[in-house]
């Protein structure tokens, strides 16, 4: 049974401005440490935009937004063995998922020229 669903569209230009102004410091504010290690040097802005879209969709699925002690670094976008994005929740985000009775997550992520979009589904 679906216990939460969230969707987000992130403008890549908005992320590019943060990256241009703050660089690595910007990335470390929104990425989990495991994501920082996986961030490509070739196109970090698209990577950041995609990860941010998933994180926004995830907090919508959790029903909290970025509040109640849940921040972007509590949500990690990992990579499943087949290469698909995989949600890994930490801290209060993981506790909220457990409180909802969710045991599985589903993530879809796509990039366009100007936007990144993501859908997150939490399932019990």
UniProtKB/Swiss-Prot annotation:
EC id: 2.7.8.7
Entry's Gene Ontology molecular function annotations: holo-[acyl-carrier-protein] synthase activity; magnesium ion binding
Major localization class: cytoplasm
Domain of life (superkingdom): Bacteria
Coiled coil: none
Disulphide bridges: none
The family this protein is said to belong to: Belongs to the P-Pant transferase superfamily. AcpS family.
Protein name (database record): Holo-[acyl-carrier-protein] synthase
């Amino acid at each position: 049974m679906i216990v939460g669903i969230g969707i987000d569209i992130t403008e890549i230009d908005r992320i590019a401005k943060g990256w241009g102004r703050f660089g690595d410091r910007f990335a470390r504010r929104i990425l989990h440490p495991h994501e920082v290690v996986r961030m490509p040097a070739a196109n970090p802005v698209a990577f950041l935009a995609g990860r941010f879209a998933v994180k926004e969709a995830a907090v919508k699925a959790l029903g909290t937004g970025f509040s109640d002690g849940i921040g972007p670094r509590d949500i990690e976008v990992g990579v499943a063995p087949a290469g698909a994005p995989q949600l890994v929740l930490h801290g209060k985000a993981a506790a909220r998922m457990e409180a909802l009775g969710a045991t599985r997550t589903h993530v879809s992520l796509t990039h366009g020229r100007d936007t990144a979009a993501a859908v997150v589904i939490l399932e019990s």
